Amino acid sequence: MDNSKDDLICIGFEGTAEKSGVGIITSKGEVLFNKTIIYTPPVQGIHPREAADHHAETFVKLLKEALNEVPLEKIDLVSFSLGPGLGPSLRVTATTARALSLSINKPIIGVNHCIGHVEIGKLTTDAVDPLTLYVSGGNTQVLAYTGKKYRVIGETLDIAIGNCLDQFARHCNLPHPGGVYVEKFAKDGNKFIKLPYTVKGMDLSLSGLLTSAMKKYDSKERIEDVCYSLQETSFSMLTEITERALAHTNKAEVMLVGGVAANNRLKEMLKVMCEEQNVDFYVPEKQFCGDNGAMIAWLGILQYLNGKRMDLKDTKPISNYRSDMVEVNWIHDESKNLNDGNIKSRKIPKHLIGKGAEADISKGRYLEFESITKERVKKGYRILKLDELIRTRRTVKEARFLAAVKECGIHAPSIYDIDKENKKIIMGYIHGKIAKDEIEEGNIEFCKSLGETIGKMHGSGIVHNDLTTSNFIISKNPYIIDFGLGKYSDLIEDKAIDLIVLKKSIMSIHYDKFDLVWNKIIDGYKTYELAESVLECIKEVEKRARYL
């Protein structure tokens, strides 16, 4: 490559699943060509081998079209999607890129498909340091850049949202891709059907929701009403975990990317949530939402210009290539640390002492006691029936579990009053700092006591379901708060997922202290008699994660 050129040109090949994409882009961010062809199976469902055959045919056609726009001799770099994705599709894509690289004697770079979505979004919008919700057929993740990596703060624990919608559509004999038809039918729905709503901290589960929606359809509910209810429930869950991640990271921007980002209802929900949280919202234009070659080409340029090089022997596809496996070499501004003050962060209204994903927190007095009032405010993005159900249920649940853990000898705020109608809890004010702030200031000795507290809670058959460093107050002892998602369970896997949620929350903003903090927490947790079984289960749950 001629490194003296002012404007380098890269061609990118995207082929991780059923979409073949070729894009050409310059190092100044000018898109010269971008076209995607989707494989539509003759029968329902995508067969990996047939998708690979589709790539083999369409890459030739797309390449000819691309080179009619940009002569071959102007190409300086070849980029392709290294993963994650379907093995056969990835292999055809890599082979195509290698063949072109060898034939024109130009360097080649394999890139992460997921991060390609994020970077093309940043290029084509005004987003600088966003919290990103990435939603597609094979991926559902909440991502944030910190410490030279895009950290996975939240994700699906089973199936991706796009797959959920497609499977439901197939069950109803609707064509592929099913999400388009679900959105179309949902517009004519007028009856909300209660479906499972499963959020665990900043993670979510969609398999139970899918099964229930299928059963509702089979029971002769109108398809319009089932689609409406499926979409409202699943998208509310997606918006909620994004809002939870926003409250934990204090980012000032949210960006929506991926194929499901084309859904207008999801965009509307996220826009409303961002307005309520007073942060900026971005979504790329439609051609850059779904899988496309331009995003692969752009990420290839970013990596190459910042020193990334690849030999052909290093271009073997990685089907489980997670976003957080990539060392980010193209972002050099370390002011993206949350506490530096050199980049925008979410602002808390002055009349509040805290604003979480669910509630506004204000300080006052109850009789002669210092107190706080926690009000679960209405969420404009959720339909009224669902919003009322969730806020009422969680208000009551939180009060019950705060009382329950205190009976188990665990430190928690005292409940003074509950206003179920207005979704308010008045509780004792705890003098101290949240664990997140203590850790950021370098104080970590208390972390062992966090583990002991969690172990005692699990030993009492209580699972928090939203363990983050934002949900502990450090006073003379650690106080645990925010039990809106809590439940009783003796299942080892439920306790393992509780710790996984905490683990990801620590990695998302305390990455530079992660080993020290996590090891101390685990040391304390081992006082729980079933700790080893839970820790072993964590490994099993993390290994089986399919959607990357």
Curated annotation (Swiss-Prot):
Pfam families membership: RIO1, TsaD
Superkingdom to which the source organism belongs: Archaea
CDD domains: ASKHA_NBD_Kae1_arch_bac (cd24131)
Annotated cofactor note: Binds 1 Fe(2+) ion per subunit.
EC number(s) reported in the record: 2.3.1.234, 2.7.11.1
Main location: cytoplasm
Residue intervals of the Protein kinase domain: 347-548
GO cellular component: cytoplasm; EKC/KEOPS complex
Subcellular location: Cytoplasm
Catalytic reaction equation(s): L-seryl-[protein] + ATP = O-phospho-L-seryl-[protein] + ADP + H(+); L-threonyl-[protein] + ATP = O-phospho-L-threonyl-[protein] + ADP + H(+); L-threonylcarbamoyladenylate + adenosine(37) in tRNA = N(6)-L-threonylcarbamoyladenosine(37) in tRNA + AMP + H(+)
Region (Kae1): 1-330
SUPFAM superfamilies, sorted: Actin-like ATPase domain (SSF53067), Protein kinase-like (PK-like) (SSF56112)
Binding-site residues, L-threonylcarbamoyladenylate: Y134, V135, S136, G137, G138, D166, G179, E183, N263
GO molecular-function terms, A-Z: ATP binding; iron ion binding; metalloendopeptidase activity; N(6)-L-threonylcarbamoyladenine synthase activity; protein serine kinase activity; protein serine/threonine kinase activity; protein serine/threonine/tyrosine kinase activity; zinc ion binding
Active site (record annotation): D466 (proton acceptor)
Cofactor list: Fe(2+)
Binding residue positions for ATP: I353, G354, K355, G356, A357, E358, A359, D360, I361, K374
Subunit structure: Component of the KEOPS complex that consists of Kae1, Bud32, Cgi121 and Pcc1; the whole complex dimerizes.
Family the UniProt entry places it in: In the N-terminal section; belongs to the KAE1 / TsaD family.
UniProt function note: Required for the formation of a threonylcarbamoyl group on adenosine at position 37 (t(6)A37) in tRNAs that read codons beginning with adenine. Is a component of the KEOPS complex that is probably involved in the transfer of the threonylcarbamoyl moiety of threonylcarbamoyl-AMP (TC-AMP) to the N6 group of A37. The Kae1 domain likely plays a direct catalytic role in this reaction. The Bud32 domain probably displays kinase activity that regulates Kae1 function.
Name of the protein in question: Probable bifunctional tRNA threonylcarbamoyladenosine biosynthesis protein
Organism (species): Methanococcus maripaludis (strain DSM 14266 / JCM 13030 / NBRC 101832 / S2 / LL)
